[in-house]
From Swiss-Prot:
Organism of this sequence: Salmonella montevideo
Protein's name according to its UniProt entry: Flagellin
Residue ranges crossing the lipid bilayer per the database entry: none
GO cellular component annotations of the record: bacterial-type flagellum; extracellular region
Keywords noted in UniProt: Bacterial flagellum, Secreted
PANTHER family: FLAGELLIN
Length: 505
């Protein structure tokens, strides 16, 4: 080996080894301080890509587990509401069993029906107000998908169903059955509306006290008075909803036949543009709500327009029937909010929207459809019959026969077979609850499986990117020793050129 001064090969070699040990020491210290074997892609490029995919799966599955727990919470919330609905149905069934006992008086049956009605209203309230995070869970049918996986399409569907009185088949449920109506039936009809209206027919004056629902006659000899809503329902919660009220006075004529006159106030309930049909003839309401006596109802008959004002109606025009429309301009009707149709069997049958008058002119039955509900008037019978829906009639005069029936099969079935109806409703609630219970078990299973998967993925990722402290501590110790040795050797290597100077002495 040549003896040179300019190039110290031993020093350069020592420095190179010292740099290597320094790099190893830095890497070991970085891994020990971070706990990771892979701190950047240069540490292990392939391992970093694999570990990153594991991280995506782990994070997605962890969130999916939380989603599944939310699904359990939704199912539990819904089932809790259904449990309350079930409790109310059980009470309704208990009351229905009590009502079928023949020892009950009319007062007992009314009390039972009142509690049943409250229970049914509570079922509707629970249905409308139960929600989870702003989502109503019983007010409509809904297929709610819960993401329980890290990839697209990995979902479990919760089948939320609408559960209320109507969907349970209990709309119009009545264990009290048909009964004769009295003035007492009117007293809660307009409980949320204040004020009264006074109408006159001839010499007689009538006043409807809307606040109490009572009907008052100002003359000494009260005639038969009907109070009805033109839209087929008396009950109203808002004075602004324009529910029309008609008063009908029925007296016995000299010829022994029943005569009816109407006191017009119902036209105030219509709104401009509303129409009604009679025997294919369409009437259009020209009056606006709150108009005076100049408000109009118009149609075209045989190519000629027929117009009536409120004042015309108030004079007591004749009832509408097929013959009237086909041969005369003398047309009378009450006005409603929306559309209605008469369905007369003969030309001579007479019918009004808000009341079906049973008299000598009625042959068989006349039928009227109001907002989708059908009612019939029959010349036979001597009682006012209520079945199912809200319909209040005051029948106080003698010698007049009126029969009003609701043509609703569901209501009749409920009244005839109350226990079967309740059992059917309970079965539906049980089916929904069973479905929710099964879905909760599915979520529990999914959560367990997700937990196992996340654990295994974490283990696999750890083997790739986590630092092995035993190995790294050993590497650090080795690097430290090499650093110390290298530093000492470098000092010796740097002294080699000094030895060359001895040759010059």
């Amino acid at each position: 080996m040549a003896q040179v001064i300019n190039t110290n090969s031993l020093s350069l070699l020592t420095q190179n080894n010292l740099n290597k040990s320094q790099s190893s020491l830095s890497s070991a210290i970085e891994r020990l301080s971070s706990g990771l074997r892979i701190n950047s892609a240069k540490d292990d490029a392939a391992g970093q890509a694999i570990a990153n995919r594991f991280t995506s799966n782990i994070k997605g599955l962890t969130q999916a587990s939380r989603n599944a727990n939310d699904g359990i919470s939704i199912a539990q919330t819904t089932e809790g509401a259904l449990n309350e609905i079930n409790n109310n149905l059980q009470r309704v069934r208990e009351l229905s069993v009590q009502a079928t006992n023949g020892t009950n008086s009319d007062s007992d049956l009314k009390s039972i029906q009142d509690e049943i009605q409250q229970r049914l209203e509570e079922i509707d309230r629970v249905s409308n107000q139960t929600q989870f995070n702003g989502v109503k869970v019983l007010s409509q049918d809904n297929q709610m998908k819960i993401q329980v996986g890290a990839n697209d399409g990995e979902t479990i569907t919760i089948d939320l169903q609408k559960i209320d009185v109507k969907s349970l088949g209990l709309d119009g449920f009545n264990v009290n059955g048909p009964k004769e109506a009295t003035v007492g039936d009117l007293k809660s009809s307009f409980k949320n509306v204040t004020g009264y209206d006074t109408y006159a027919a001839g010499a007689n004056k009538y006043r409807v006290d809307i606040n109490s629902g009572a009907v008052v006659t100002d003359d000494a000899a009260p005639d038969k008075v009907y109070v009805n809503a033109a839209n087929g329902q008396l009950t109203t919660d808002d004075a602004e909803n324009n529910t029309a009220v008609n008063l009908f006075k029925t007296t016995k004529s000299a010829a022994g036949t029943d005569e009816a006159k109407a006191i017009a106030g119902a036209i105030k309930g219509g709104k401009e543009g509303d129409t009604f049909d009679y025997k294919g003839v369409t009437f259009t309401i020209d009056t606006k709500t709150g108009d005076d006596g100049n408000g109009k109802v118009s149609t075209t008959i045989n190519g000629e327009k027929v117009t009536l004002t409120v004042a015309d109606i108030a004079t007591g025009a004749t009832d509408v029937n097929a013959a009237t429309l086909q041969s005369s301009k003398n047309v009378y009707t009450s006005v409603v909010n929306g559309q209605f149709t008469f369905d007369d069997k003969t030309k001579n049958e007479s019918a009004k929207l808000s009341d079906l008058e049973a008299n000598n002119a009625v042959k068989g039955e006349s039928k009227i459809t109001v907002n989708g509900a059908e009612y019939t008037a029959n010349a036979a019978g001597d009682k006012v019959t209520l079945a199912g829906k809200t319909m209040f009639i005051d029948k106080t005069a003698s010698g007049v026969s009126t029969l009003i029936n609701e043509d609703a099969a569901a209501a009749k079935k409920s009244t005839a077979n109350p226990l079967a109806s309740i059992d059917s409703a309970l079965s539906k609630v049980d089916a929904v609850r069973s479905s929710l219970g099964a879905i909760q078990n599915r979520f529990d299973s999914a959560i367990t499986n997700l937990g196992n998967t996340v654990t295994n993925l974490n283990s696999a990722r750890s083997r790739i990117e986590d630092a092995d402290y035993a190995t790294e501590v050993s590497n650090m110790s080795k690097a430290q020793i090499l650093q110390q040795a290298g530093t000492s050797v470098l000092a010796q290597a740097n002294q080699v050129p000094q030895n060359v100077l001895s040759l010059l002495r």
